[in-house]
């Protein structure tokens, strides 16, 4: 029941350090097996992945082993801070990231999705070994993990490999994770924001905050499928509406529309590059106002 303060960006920091193994780097070990590896942290999860055409079972074991073992020192944590701060500064100078993340952050008053995943250089510099260990022990437990494998594999053989791997390990009792309910207002935090940067073409994203949070997984799937289908019908490269907007100069090939839905937040993003960003904004608003009256051609 104890509340613990953790600096912003800890999940991303931990992702960086998870590749440190006792005898080297996990990415190098994957390369020795003929595989490429990567990882990413979003507002809701951290994922570790590999891609390979050979040694599939060995790669799965390596994935399990390095994710289920934390090898950090005070020195290695301090060294990583400079690397992460450079990454943060790189994203701060990236106009595509600035408009994308700004469009999301401006929707929310309190929800942590408005906080940059990497944190700030200040929060990174206030992150220490004991904090990373606490987060690892709390969240990196098999009960809070999912393994997803796709490929030309023998499922029964691979499941046997996984069970044997896990049976060799001792895991601490699962920590009950209590997620505090966030009282997020229904209004958006910032209606409009214009930043000035050196860009070849202006960038605009219209974001829509969805306040109805669905609890039923089936309802969530239905809503996600419905909106993704709508966007595919309207804005795929072969759709009549997309090509009409393209021909009239309302949009260019950078235009996109997407729907994101997580446990306790959901939003829509629509936008792209356009010198006349007010024209693009007007086009998107008009689409939103009349989407219920939209007629979809059969060949779309």
Question: Model-flagged regions — what are they?
Answer:
Residues 8-20, 228:
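Active-site recognition of the HExxH zinc-binding catalytic motif
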Residues 1-8:
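Short pre-active-site segment immediately N-terminal to the catalytic Zn-binding motif
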Residues 172-240:
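His/Glu-based metal-binding/catalytic segments typifying zinc-dependent metallopeptidases
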Residues 21, 25-177, 220-222, 231-232, ...:
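Charge-rich, well-structured scaffold segments of protease-associated domains
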């Amino acid at each position: 029941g104890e509340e613990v303060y953790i600096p912003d960006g800890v999940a991303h920091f931990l992702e960086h350090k998870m590749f440190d193994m006792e005898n080297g780097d996990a990415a190098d070990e994957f390369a020795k097996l003929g595989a490429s590896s990567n990882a990413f942290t979003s507002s809701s999860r951290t994922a570790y992945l590999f891609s390979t055409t050979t040694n599939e079972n060995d790669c799965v074991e390596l994935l399990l082993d390095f994710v289920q073992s934390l090898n950090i020192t005070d020195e290695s944590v301090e060294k990583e801070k400079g690397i992460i701060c450079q990454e943060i500064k790189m994203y701060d100078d990236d106009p595509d990231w600035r408009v994308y993340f700004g469009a999301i952050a401006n929707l929310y008053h309190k929800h942590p999705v408005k906080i940059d995943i990497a944190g700030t250089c200040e929060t990174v510099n206030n992150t220490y070994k004991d904090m990373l260990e606490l987060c690892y022990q709390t969240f990196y437990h098999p009960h809070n993990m999912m393994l997803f494998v796709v490929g030309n594999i023998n499922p029964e053989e691979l499941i046997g490999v996984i069970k044997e791997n896990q049976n060799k390990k001792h895991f601490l009792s699962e920590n009950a994770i209590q997620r505090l309910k966030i009282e997020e207002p229904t209004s958006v935090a910032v209606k409009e924001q214009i930043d000035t940067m050196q860009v070849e073409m202006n960038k605009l994203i219209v974001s829509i905050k969805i306040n109805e949070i669905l609890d039923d997984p089936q309802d969530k799937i239905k809503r996600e499928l419905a909106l993704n289908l709508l966007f595919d019908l309207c804005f795929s490269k072969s759709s009549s509406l997309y090509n009409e907007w393209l021909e009239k100069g309302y949009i260019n090939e950078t235009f996109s529309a997407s729907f994101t839905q997580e446990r306790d937040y959901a939003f829509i993003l629509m936008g792209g590059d356009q010198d006349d960003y007010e024209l693009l904004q007007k086009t998107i608003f008009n689409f939103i106002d009349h989407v219920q009256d939209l007629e979809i051609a059969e060949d779309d």
